[in-house]
Swiss-Prot record:
Residues 195-235 form a coiled coil. Gene3D superfamilies: arf6 gtpase in complex with a specific effector, jip4 (1.20.5.1000). This is Uncharacterized protein B475L. Residues 297-332 are annotated as: Disordered. Keywords: Coiled coil, Glycoprotein, Host membrane, Late protein, Membrane, Transmembrane, Transmembrane helix. Residues 301-329 have a biased composition (Polar residues). It comes from African swine fever virus (isolate Pig/Kenya/KEN-50/1950) (ASFV). Induction: Expressed in the late phase of the viral replicative cycle. GO terms for cellular component: host cell membrane; membrane. The lineage of its organism: Viruses, Varidnaviria, Bamfordvirae, Nucleocytoviricota, Pokkesviricetes.
Length: 480
């Protein structure tokens, strides 16, 4: 045992000797003056002393002053040398580590000493009043004096050493041990760290958003530029289609589509009425040309009743002399009307005169149609006669070549009578004004030729070089 430990034990033994004397001698003497049972009276005196020290401040100060004087006498230290404050520091320092005792104030040491004394007195009084100790203190005191006092001193020293160890550990824990945080503090710390992580994520997302917005702005500018280029190309393509369609005299499909409502393309009626493919239309057009050639072969021979003069070429367009059918399906009517018109020209009747005659006398046309339907063999006989007698047409041509004076007489008659020629010119101008309006662009292409060859009697001549791939230009039709 070192010197420091022996000094502490000597202080603790002096500490215990003072209070054991009070409990064993002083309180026992006070119990003898009472008339009640000495055991019960002694217990009462012990409890009263403990409560007085804890609750009565004056009694505590009186007890402490008495203990101070006792300490000075036992240790043989002069009271002038050991002041009361030094006494308090000496007692308290024996319970605390040196590194902490110097930093604690005197007021703090007074409170520590008060707690130590109150706790010590309470535990010592409880130990003395137990059934094990009380009979030996009250009865047979002289016989049991040494044994009882020795047990009381051992208990006092053991308690003070234990108390010293508790205070040592308490101060050491304050130095090395961090007190655990409360649940609220832990929650605050956890949420603070989570909040910092969220703020970091927000900063990253904000920067990413800025970069994405910049990319979006760039893409939007590119899209607007491409869209403007696309619109310009579509407009140029549309203009090119319009120019090509106008140059080829094809259907104005683009304008037609523009005028249609948005729901028109989904209509079943429109799908039924929609124009057929260009290839199908061209195929039908070729068939029409072949049928026209076949019909012209049947009527290529001129009647024997009319002389055929030398042919002359004139520039003309479709007029009243050539009726235009209104649909592709009326091919037979078109051929019949063309043959009827040729016969009318042979007989010296203009198309305008025939139209006026038909309008004024509709029953005549009905009678003619009914007669043709009832007697189809007459027209077949005429065609068969023309085919069987080609020499009649040759005789007419030969007659015109052998008698040129007839044509000279006609020219002289025109010179002597200019009013007749003026009437002929006016009649031609009227024919030009009455030209039909071609509504079907495919038929317009069909009537495209700028020149046709007619003879002086009004009959057009058929050429043997007529081909199905004709796409416009001069057409010469010669009757042989």
């Amino acid at each position: 045992m070192d010197q420091e430990e022996s000094h502490v034990i000597s202080i603790f033994e002096t500490f215990g000797a003072y209070f054991i004397n009070i409990f064993y001698n002083f309180l026992y003497k006070n119990a003898l003056y009472k008339k009640h049972s000495i055991v019960m009276e002694y217990q009462y005196q012990v409890k009263g002393y403990i409560l007085g020290v804890k609750q009565n401040k004056k009694l505590y100060e009186k007890m402490l002053d008495s203990f101070y004087k006792y300490f000075c006498n036992i240790t043989q230290i002069n009271s002038k040398t050991l002041s009361f404050s030094n006494f308090v520091s000496t007692i308290v320092d024996s319970f605390l580590p040196k590194e902490y005792s110097q930093s604690i104030s005197l007021e703090k040491k007074d409170s520590i000493l008060e707690l130590l004394l109150c706790d010590y007195i309470s535990n010592l009084g409880t130990f003395i009043t137990t059934e094990k100790m009380l009979p030996f203190i009250v009865k047979n005191r002289k016989e049991n004096y040494h044994r009882i006092t020795k047990e009381m001193q051992d208990y006092s020293l053991t308690f003070l050493l234990k108390k010293r160890m508790e205070l040592y550990n308490k101060f050491l824990r304050k130095q090395a041990y961090v007190e655990p945080k409360t649940e609220l503090e832990e929650t605050y710390t956890r949420l603070s760290s989570y909040n910092r992580s969220l703020l970091y994520q927000i900063e990253e997302l904000t920067s990413e958003k800025k970069s994405l917005l910049a990319e979006l702005s760039t893409l939007r500018k590119k899209y607007e530029k491409r869209q403007s280029e696309y619109r310009r190309l579509v407009q140029l393509l549309y203009q090119q289609i319009q120019r090509s369609s106008s140059s080829k005299n094809s259907y104005p499909l683009t304008k037609f589509i523009e005028t249609l409502p948005s729901e028109h393309f989904s209509n079943e009626d429109y799908q039924k009425e929609a124009p057929r493919d260009q290839k199908q239309v061209e195929t039908e057009l070729l068939k029409q040309q072949e049928e026209l050639l076949a019909s012209q072969e049947l009527t290529s021979k001129s009647p024997s009743n009319y002389p055929v003069p030398q042919s002359r070429t004139i520039v003309s367009k479709p007029s009243d002399n050539y009726p235009v059918p209104q649909s592709r399906s009326s091919k037979i009517d078109f051929d019949n009307s063309l043959q009827n018109q040729e016969l009318n020209v042979k007989n010296g009747f203009s198309g305008k005169t025939i139209l006026e005659l038909n309008q004024d006398n509709p029953e005549i046309e009905e009678d003619i149609l009914e007669f043709n339907q009832d007697n189809p063999e007459i027209e077949e006989d005429i065609l068969e006669f023309n085919q069987d007698n080609p020499e009649i047409e040759e005789d007419i041509l030969k007659f015109n070549q052998d008698n040129p004076e007839i044509e000279e007489d006609i020219l002289k008659l025109n010179q002597d009578n200019p009013e007749i020629e003026e009437e002929v010119i006016l009649e031609k101008e009227n024919h030009k004004e009455d030209e039909p309006i071609v509504q079907n662009p495919f038929l317009e292409n069909f009537w495209k030729p700028e020149q046709k060859t007619f003879n002086q009697s009004g009959l057009f001549e058929e050429s043997s070089d007529f081909s199905n791939d004709w796409s416009g230009g001069d057409v010469t039709l010669n009757f042989s």
